[in-house]
From Swiss-Prot:
EC nos: 4.1.1.49
Cofactor binding, note field: Binds 1 Mn(2+) ion per subunit.
Gene3D superfamilies xrefs: 3.90.228.20, Phosphoenolpyruvate Carboxykinase, domain 1, Phosphoenolpyruvate Carboxykinase, domain 2
Cofactor(s) for this UniProt protein: Mn(2+)
The keyword Translocase is assigned to this record: no
Catalytic reaction(s) noted: oxaloacetate + ATP = phosphoenolpyruvate + ADP + CO2
Family membership: Belongs to the phosphoenolpyruvate carboxykinase (ATP) family.
Pathways per UniProt: Carbohydrate biosynthesis; gluconeogenesis
Gene Ontology CC, one term: cytosol
Residues annotated as binding ATP: 201, 220, 236-244, 285, 322, 447
Organism: Sinorhizobium medicae (strain WSM419) (Ensifer medicae)
Function: Involved in the gluconeogenesis. Catalyzes the conversion of oxaloacetate (OAA) to phosphoenolpyruvate (PEP) through direct phosphoryl transfer between the nucleoside triphosphate and OAA.
A Gene Ontology BP annotation from the UniProt entry: gluconeogenesis
Protein name (Swiss-Prot/TrEMBL): Phosphoenolpyruvate carboxykinase (ATP)
Length: 536
């Protein structure tokens, strides 16, 4: 076995059971990984120097194929209603079979860190079959200084072998695709999928398990900080605008997806960004667009023309096209990945029903209610001929990555909001003037203007009305924003149709929250939406 690159000489792959490998390349950097990926036909070079790979059958995560080992340590700690269990015996069989499958292979290893706060960091070794996967995860996690590699000690190891096919009969899984996590022993096994996002979300899942025990709140959010040290957190599901809205030229970006919040403030889990690229434009998102023109960026499932120019309008492979780049590619990104205690929390939703206002102020109890609800609405794929929006409730704005019961995260959030006097806002980046198919997407300029007023504190002094359906406070007027758009009912041609749609959405919220009723106190239950008379 030939071993190349910088590493801790006392910890090779044989320490986790690998044997008879061909070549192992440790901690290769971008240029080296480009050479490897291109030489093996894994990816294409774009006209501007980015690397573009296709993931084949899997163009997104496979949440139904994700498992957690159920053992003596995890049996009472995991929210099993939301996490599928795998036995220690089946996991060990899977591990042995993956190690056997790897014999004769050349593999890539990256020694990285999850968590910019040294006290809460998770040193992570990622072993991949593909060079482009190695570059992807190198972009996404925190890269230690080169001299630190010689003493690197991983607490988590991820083995990612897309060519390995799991066996439901032999491994106790659902399909040939598997993402299995042994939280007790710090090992994640990924097989049967080339979608690179599985690696980053596996690190997130492990941190989401470990950190609450240390009274640190793990969050599926983006974060930025203003010149006055005013940190803002942006919660939101995929497609709601976390990455876009936190990339603000007037504020320092902490990170776009995963953070922790503890006694010292906020810290990024990552050292890079994983931005959606579908319909990406230089006009709307100049900073993210610029990263696609750079050497080192990895693009996933973006269609290239014959000149190797990316066509961001083309969703023929998937709507979930992505680009992964180091955080320092964003001009005003934080160099430390840390920020003071947050002053503002923004909960983003893309309401395709056209019911929610573009912004609303939340009480701490309403904030916990909406955090546990985790609402957005997806628009069905046009290929199915379905135009009705579909409500999606993903608790904590990231249910697939939350191993513990949502109430653990919700109570921690409520405590941190109260302790730090944080102002909370719900922001709708979805539809206005009607539901999807009738109305139009909320203009990003409107959203940015409202966010600016919320973040600089000027929105706190606005006049508010109480929303008739949800009970939260909605500003009546905001400088630079047309007042009509602040009241969603007035943007609909038919007010009665709006009322009916709003009632349906309220009922969806109430039905979804039933499972949390027994886990929250009365003040949070009272924050539920319901028919109210608007206080004009």
């Amino acid at each position: 076995m030939e071993e190349l690159g910088s590493r801790n000489p006392s910890i090779g792959l044989e320490s986790i059971g690998f044997s008879d490998l061909s070549v192992v390349r440790y901690n290769f950097e971008a240029a080296q990984l480009y050479e490897e990926a291109l030489a093996h036909g894994e990816a294409e070079l774009t006209a501007h120097g980015a690397l573009c790979a296709r993931t084949g059958q899997h163009t997104g995560r496979s949440p139904k194929d994700k498992y957690v080992v159920r053992d003596a340590n995890t049996a009472d700690q995991i929210w099993w209603d939301n996490n599928s269990a795998i036995s220690p015996e089946n996991f060990d069989r899977l591990r042995q079979d993956m190690l056997a499958h790897a014999k004769g292979m050349s593999l890539y290893v990256q020694d990285l860190v999850g968590g910019a706060d040294p006290e809460n960091a998770l040193p992570t070794r990622v072993v991949t079959e593909f060079a482009w996967h190695s570059l992807f995860i190198r972009n996404l996690l925190i890269r230690p200084e080169r001299e630190a590699l010689s003493s690197f000690q991983p607490m988590l190891t991820i083995i990612d072998l897309p060519s390995f096919k799991a066996s439901p009969e032999r491994h106790g899984c659902r399909s040939e695709t598997v993402i299995a996590c042994d939280l007790t022993n710090g090992l994640v096994l990924i097989g049967g999928t080339s979608y690179a996002g599985e690696m980053k979300k596996s690190v997130f899942t492990v941190l989401n398990y470990l950190l609450p025990r240390k009274s640190v709140m793990p969050m599926h959010c983006s974060a930025n900080v203003g010149p006055a040290g005013d940190t803002a957190i942006f919660f939101g599901l995929s497609g709601t605008g976390k990455t876009t809205l936190s990339a603000d030229p007037n504020r320092t970006l902490i990170g776009d997806d995963e953070h922790g919040w503890g006694e010292k403030g906020v810290f990024n889990f990552e050292g890079g960004c994983y931005a959606k690229a579908i319909r990406l434009s230089e006009a709307a998102e100049p900073e993210i667009f610029a990263t696609t023109q750079r050497f080192g960026t990895v693009m996933e499932n973006v269609v290239l023309d014959e000149r190797r120019m990316p066509d961001f309008e083309d969703g023929s492979l998937t709507e979930n096209t992505r680009c992964a780049y180091p955080l320092h590619f964003i001009p005003n990104a934080s160099k430390t990945g840390t920020a003071p205690q947050p002053r503002t929390i923004i909960m983003l939703t893309a309401d395709a029903f056209g019911v929610l206002p573009p912004i609303a102020k939340l009480t701490p109890e309403q904030a916990m209610y909406h955090f546990l609800s985790g609402y957005t609405a997806k628009v069905a794929g046009t290929e199915k001929g379905v135009t009705e929006p579909e409500a999606t409730f993903s608790t904590c704005f990231g249910a697939p990555f939350m191993p513990r019961h949502p109430s653990e995260y919700g109570n921690l959030l409520k405590e941190l909001i109260a302790r730090n006097g944080v102002t909370c806002w719900l922001v709708n980046t979805g539809w206005t003037g009607g539901a999807y198919g009738t109305g139009s997407r909320m203009p990003i300029k409107v959203t940015r203007a409202l966010l600016s007023a919320a973040l600089d504190g000027s929105l706190n002094s606005a006049s508010f009305r109480s929303d008739a359906n949800f009970g939260f406070a909605v500003p009546v007027s905001v400088p630079g924003v047309e007042s009509r758009i602040l009241d969603p009912r007035s943007t609909w041609a038919d007010g009665a149709a709006y009322d009916a749609q709003a009632r349906r959405l309220v009922d969806m919220f109430i039905a979804n929250f039933a499972k949390f009723e027994s886990h929250v106190d009365g003040s949070v239950r009272d924050a539920a939406p319901g028919a109210r008379i608007a206080a004009e």
